[in-house]
């Protein structure tokens, strides 16, 4: 069993501006507060095949989240496979609403390991992760709307 989490936000910035920020993986910890540190596992820093390890902290729980980038469509979508303790897939989607407005959508389907409660952890974790990721999107929005 897995849980799908989907959050989105409209950002008052151009598609180019939003893409330029989000496509810099090393900057994700600036707005993803649960991502404490990002370590590249490949020489590549972007694009399909890039691998990262992310030290993730949610409340008292810390774990390394290993991801491989599987989709990289310029100004459209970035996709990942989670291949560590937490497995699943994720995608960030970019949609131009107008010249100075962009919709950013983040979708993740995750499977929790048994020591994090397995299906029970997924059930109770979903609203917590939704809350955190909505905050992350607000943090991203603030980068452009200060």
Say what each PLM segment does.
Residues 1-10, 101, 134, 138, ...:
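Hydrophobic-ligand-binding modules of eukaryotic lipid transfer/binding families
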Residues 1-42, 47:
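Hydrophobic ligand-binding cavity/cleft-lining segments
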Residues 39-86, 99, 115, 135-146:
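Glycine-rich portal/gate segments that line the openings of hydrophobic small-molecule binding cavities
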Residues 18-22, 28, 52-54, 69, ...:
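Hydrophobic pocket/interface hotspot
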Residues 15, 35, 51, 76-77, ...:
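Structural motif
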Residues 10-14, 55-59, 70, 95-97, ...:
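Solvent-exposed residues in well-ordered beta-strands and their adjoining turns
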Residues 6-8, 64-66, 89-91, 107:
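Well-ordered beta-strand positions in beta-sheet-rich domains
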Residues 81-131:
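Beta-strand/loop substructures that line and gate deep hydrophobic ligand-binding cavities in soluble
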């Amino acid at each position: 069993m897995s849980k799908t989490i989907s959050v989105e936000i409209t950002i008052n910035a151009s598609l180019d501006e939003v893409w330029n920020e989000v496509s810099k993986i090393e900057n994700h910890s600036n707005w993803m507060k649960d991502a404490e540190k990002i370590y590249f596992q490949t020489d590549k820093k972007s694009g399909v095949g890039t691998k990262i390890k992310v030290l993730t902290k949610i409340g008292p729980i810390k774990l390394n989240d290993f991801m491989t980038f599987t989709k990289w469509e310029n100004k459209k979508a970035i996709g990942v496979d989670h291949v560590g303790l937490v497995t699943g897939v994720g995608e960030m989607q970019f949609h131009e609403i107008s010249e100075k407005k962009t919709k950013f959508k983040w979708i993740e389907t995750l499977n929790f390991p048994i020591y994090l409660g397995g299906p029970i952890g997924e059930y109770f974790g979903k609203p917590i992760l939704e809350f955190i990721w909505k905050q992350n999107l607000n943090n991203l929005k603030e980068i452009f709307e200060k």
